[in-house]
Amino acid sequence: MLYINSFLDRMGEIIRGEKSVEEADKLLDQKNIFEMFRSDCEEILNLYKSGKAEKEEVQRNFYLLKTYVVSQLSIHFERLKEFAESKGFKIEKKLDPEVINEIALYIDRVEKEV
């Protein structure tokens, strides 16, 4: 099953200790978050256009990505901040609900290209 979600992948790397907890600060930057999801959408679309992914797979990935953004992104954002703080690294960032909306709308726009 195709599922591309760079934010979730990078968060997992930090929690598993594969990446330094200091990386969480960069990961939680709102511009970086938007760029990761934009890049994921482009990668998914390119897989479809190149014939490496079926239409159904791509549509499902967009659906799952949008569902993640709307229902889980802010929760994981806060959990990663808490995790970093438990390791002695305080992060003072907040996730603006408008960023979540922008990402969801972007996914909608790209999804229409399939």
From Swiss-Prot:
Organism: Archaeoglobus fulgidus (strain ATCC 49558 / DSM 4304 / JCM 9628 / NBRC 100126 / VC-16)
Cleaved signal peptide residues: none
Pfam families noted in UniProt: AF0941-like (PF14591)
The name this protein goes by in its record: Uncharacterized protein AF_0941
